[in-house]
Design a protein with these regions (language model features):
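N-terminal Rossmann NAD(P)H-binding glycine-rich loop of SDR-like oxidoreductase domains
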Residues: 2-24
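NAD(P)H-binding glycine-rich loop region in Rossmannoid oxidoreductase-like domains
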Residues: 48-88, 101
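Active-site "gating" loop of Rossmann-like NAD(P)-dependent oxidoreductase/epimerase domains
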Residues: 72-75, 80, 112-134, 164-166
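NAD(P)-cofactor binding segment of oxidoreductase domains
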Residues: 80-108, 141
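Active-site Tyr-X1-5-Lys
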Residues: 131-159, 184
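Alpha-helical substrate-binding/gating segment
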Residues: 181-196, 202-230
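Mid/C-terminal beta-alpha module of Rossmann-like enzyme folds, strongest
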Residues: 199, 215-216, 222-267, 272-273
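Conserved C-terminal active-site "lid" loop/helix of NAD(P)H-dependent oxidoreductases
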Residues: 237-243, 260-298, 302-304
Length: 305
């Protein structure tokens, strides 16, 4: 049985991937804030900035595939804490890529639409010109370049990611003080009967974490190489996404307050077009879930909480 090691196994994507892959692979991983405590999966607390410990762990473990879900993805935090952002999003990724090459492990690294400036009129394809407009996007681009120096490696970009972890503490935040994921934050606000301001002028291609985990496992099993986008075919504004999700879950849609990104007063520039084109991934045989299918799955998971 081949081995998969997941950096960030306690994350939304990492834990979903671990559960999905454990019947076909020997899965283990490291976590920072929380141990997912998944049955039959070993996980270890690890400071990934201690690269010698990382190297020792991987050399002893000898995984066939290494998946890196670790990132500081709070755009405002990255702008104000550039040293920390670069250390996690770029420097660690560069070191990890070199370690993977030395032990002959394939690296699958997760990236973001933020490597683009968000001004294109249509969805971004993999070979579109990158032009990050904030420090987070710059660090993610640096990480991508390090990984892709090795042709066998894979980088998978994603736009808006959402999902549900039933054992999660409702107000759990990441190490950069960002809510665990946008979808869960939004749902819990409405469940508490709190109003939320949602922007109307940002378009994206949201993907549920369960489907994103399927994409990652697909890239392992198909031995994909290079750069791919993971994005369902639905392009939607964040406001319309929230309206549809609230309707599906039977939550009060009147609590959703429409605002423009300018009215929201963001501290850091972000692009308004976050849509990714995933035809390249689709041509490998992967079929993305529809938005309706994703919402139905999410509702099932919430009902089980």
């Amino acid at each position: 049985m081949k081995k998969i090691f997941i950096f960030g196994i306690g994350s939304l994507t990492g834990s979903k991937l671990a559960v999905l892959a454990k019947t076909r692979y020997h899965v283990s991983g490291s976590y920072n804030l929380r141990d997912p405590q998944i049955p039959n999966i070993s996980s270890i607390h690890l400071d990934i900035t201690n690269i010698e410990k990382v190297k020792k762990l991987l050399t002893e473990n000898q995984p066939d595939f290494i998946v890196n879900t670790c990132a500081i993805n709070n755009v405002d935090y990255c702008e104000k804490n550039q040293d920390v952002a670069k250390k996690i999003n770029a420097d660690f990724v560069s070191d990890l890529s070199r370690i993977c090459q030395s032990i002959d492990s394939k690296l699958i690294h997760l990236s973001s639409d933020s490597v683009f400036d968000g001004t294109k009129k249509t969805s971004y394809v993999e070979d579109d010109l990158t032009n990050p407009i904030n420090y987070y996007g710059l660090t993610k681009l640096l990480g991508e370049k390090s990984v892709l120096k090795t042709p066998e490696n894979v980088v998978i970009r994603v736009s808006i990611l959402y999902g549900w972890l039933p054992k999660q503490i409702s107000n759990l935040q990441s190490s950069s003080m960002k809510p665990s994921n946008f979808g869960k934050w939004f749902i819990e606000k409405l469940m508490l009967n709190e109003k939320v301001k949602i922007i109307t002028d940002e378009h994206s291609t949201p993907i549920i974490a369960d489907d994103f985990a399927r994409v990652i496992l697909h890239s392992v099993e198909k031995n994909l190489k290079g750069l791919y986008h993971a994005a369902p075919h639905t392009k939607i504004t964040r406001y319309d996404f929230c309206q549809k999700l609230a309707q599906k879950l039977g939550l009060n849609q009147d609590l959703i307050i429409p605002v423009t990104s300018k009215e929201l007063g963001r501290d850091v520039m972000t692009g308004l077009n976050k849509c990714l084109d995933s035809n390249k991934m689709a041509k490998t045989g992967f079929q993305f879930m529809t938005l309706e299918e994703s919402f139905s799955l999410l509702k099932q998971q919430i009902d089980k909480k």
